[in-house]
A protein has these predicted regions:
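Chalcogenol-based redox active-site neighborhoods
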Residues: 1-160
Length: 160
């Protein structure tokens, strides 16, 4: 399981950020922290609440934020447009990201075998995980204040 202090596992997927293009995490690491916000399913209630909170209540100025789900890129493109999400979404239908971060959720009762567990990771410019949050129960959202703090700390370390 990926935890604080670990090197962030690299993975490839598809980025939905206006267009659909290849995504590799290592290519996105650099000067500012990267936040990976894993969520189970586009268009579901709690996931939409979380993505809207990240849009409206989370200060993205000091980081690069990506929402990550196992949804297909074209579904994520429609979702991103409908909810006016100003950050990229990463489509992980091959489960490379959720396996690398060990955030796999069984959703068989919904007719889908595997989705992303709701989780958030902050990765500093050196590629080290500095913050990890995992949902303990269905419908739980991250502590956005704690996430803001974690990003600020990672950004301050990069500036030092």
């Amino acid at each position: 399981m990926t935890t604080v202090g670990d090197d962030a596992p690299d993975f490839t997927a598809s980025l939905v950020d206006g267009d659909i293009e290849p995504f590799r995490l290592d290519d996105r690491l650099g000067d500012e922290p990267v936040v990976l916000a894993f969520f189970p399913a586009a268009f579901s209630n709690t996931c939409t609440d979380e993505m809207e909170a990240l849009r409206d209540e989370f200060d993205r100025g000091d980081c690069t934020l990506f929402g990550v789900s196992t949804d297909l890129p074209h579904a994520l493109a429609a979702y991103r447009t409908q909810y006016e999400l100003p950050f990229g979404l990463v489509g992980d239908p091959d489960h490379r990201a959720i396996e690398a971060y060990d955030v796999i959720e069984d959703f068989e009762h919904y007719g889908v075998e595997t989705v992303a567990q709701r989780a958030v990771f902050v990765i500093d410019g050196d590629g080290v995980v500095t913050y990890r949050w995992l949902a303990e129960h269905s419908g739980q959202e991250p502590d956005y204040d704690a996430l803001d703090e974690a990003v600020d700390e990672a950004a301050d370390e990069a500036a030092a």
